[in-house]
Design a protein with these regions (language model features):
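Bacterial N-terminal signal peptides that target proteins for export
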Residues: 2-11
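Bacterial N-terminal signal peptides
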Residues: 10-19
């Protein structure tokens, strides 16, 4: 086979791969969260971390055993909005029903909340293993994603710092996309 033909076939193959990837990316779900809602999520996170500097004398084991100071606790809220195909729009949120807040977990439900499309929760600072400083828990944890994948919600958001969100979305065909694209508003 002449070199020119081989190069053309290789180029066509690459073009096909890029086209498939672009088609898939264009169909992945996206979410829009207006600034007013993001500001209120930031406020919840800030309030949940008011005493972050009080864990500098704690270590991870102390916190995990529950014998440390539970200065911060996770928070769970129900995201209210709508979806058009795989584009989600959040218009507000309310606290989850039956919420139980713990240092490294939160429980509650949004089952009876009209217009709920998913949940958000906060990740508070935690103690470093050595206890010399607080650490951030950036992003959704593997446990968060496992729970989301096994459920029916279409949206999962974690707030892990002011203006720091991580998002997982369930597409209309059921596949979970993480990290999902958060569109500015």
């Amino acid at each position: 086979m002449p070199i020119r033909t081989s190069l053309r076939l290789a180029a066509l193959g690459l073009l096909a791969i890029f086209a498939l990837a672009a088609a898939r990316a264009s169909h992945d779900p996206v979410i829009r969260i207006p600034a007013s809602v993001r500001d209120s999520l930031n406020s919840v996170w800030s309030l949940a971390n008011t005493h972050w500097n009080e864990i500098s004398d704690q270590n991870t084991l102390t916190q995990a055993l529950g014998t440390g100071k539970p200065t911060q606790k996770e928070y769970l809220g129900c995201l209210i909005g709508d979806a058009s195909a795989d584009t989600f729009r959040v218009i507000g949120w309310i606290p989850a029903n039956d919420m139980k807040r713990f240092q490294f977990a939160v429980t509650g439900n949004c089952d009876s909340v009209p217009g709920a499309i998913g949940t958000f929760h906060t990740h508070p600072y935690r103690a470093a293993p050595t206890g010399d400083r607080p650490l951030k828990e950036p992003g959704l944890s593997q446990q968060d994603l496992t729970t989301f994948t096994g459920g029916t919600d279409r949206v999962l958001v974690v707030v892990w710092d002011v203006d720091s969100l991580d998002v997982a979305l369930r597409a209309a065909d059921g596949h979970v996309v993480h990290p999902a694209h958060l569109l500015p508003r």
